[in-house]
């Protein structure tokens, strides 16, 4: 590429810690161009509240993007109403959606190489009459992507999910031959294309205790999971399992694994967040562009206090940059 790929950053809920983290991220010089999609006055006000210096420049497509310390480029998107740190206002729900819309369009057009998302308050968006179930679903719907996979990563561990935000009683029915096949196809493809792993080794959790104990503790492994894994192994993929989730997460298995596929949200993510909370990143696999996100919420009580932890945003930005560079290399090789 002739110039460094631009990373788009949506700070998320304006009353939360997303603007704080954006201001904090701008304090250090960067080796990649970063553009915040938000109201520039919001960042100026939050910087003043935090007592941090900040110069804001208007982003103009095709022009150089600042990478200097204490300086950030902003694609201006106006708030619906003035924002007070820590106080939700549904008037600003449409503003949050507009930042995501602009990020999606920029990524699809190639203007941005990746988008990093700050935390949003789903409840206040829905209270404003906007049907919104989350970033992942929004990006999938607005890029015509029929299925995506949620993966969280921290140092030494990547965990993808076969199902995401479902009640536990609905998980078994959601794990079908078709859905598990689609999940594995997306996971393996993105580990190869976006992470540069030519032959990824993936550990697959069973659904039931002891991975079903040969059918005595549930039949999902025998009826669905094992047959799907056998089909992938027959095509040369390096999949191990199904393994009992209570023993899979130890060095004996993880030392040479590239990722773990958990069957449901609270099977895999508690381990990952115990290992790396505050320094983990959420990556959406299967999209036609790169999207990473922080692993925490809006933390309204911390907004404007200077007590927010920037660790997860730093990791999310780092992942976005590395994945963008990997994608650029692949594109150059492909011609």
Swiss-Prot record:
It is found in: Cytoplasm. Gene3D superfamilies: Isopropylmalate Dehydrogenase (3.40.718.10). Disulfide bonds: none annotated. Pathway: Cofactor biosynthesis; pyridoxine 5'-phosphate biosynthesis; pyridoxine 5'-phosphate from D-erythrose 4-phosphate: step 4/5. SUPFAM superfamilies: Isocitrate/Isopropylmalate dehydrogenase-like (SSF53659). GO terms for biological process: pyridoxal phosphate biosynthetic process; pyridoxine biosynthetic process. The keyword Mitochondrion does not apply. Keywords: Cobalt, Cytoplasm, Magnesium, Metal-binding, NAD, NADP, Oxidoreductase, Pyridoxine biosynthesis, Zinc. Its cofactor is Zn(2+); Mg(2+); Co(2+). One of its GO terms (molecular function) is magnesium ion binding. Binds 1 divalent metal cation per subunit. Can use ions such as Zn(2+), Mg(2+) or Co(2+). InterPro entries: PdxA (IPR037510), PdxA_fam (IPR005255). HAMAP family: PdxA. Homodimer. NCBIfam families: pdxA. This is 4-hydroxythreonine-4-phosphate dehydrogenase. The gene is pdxA.
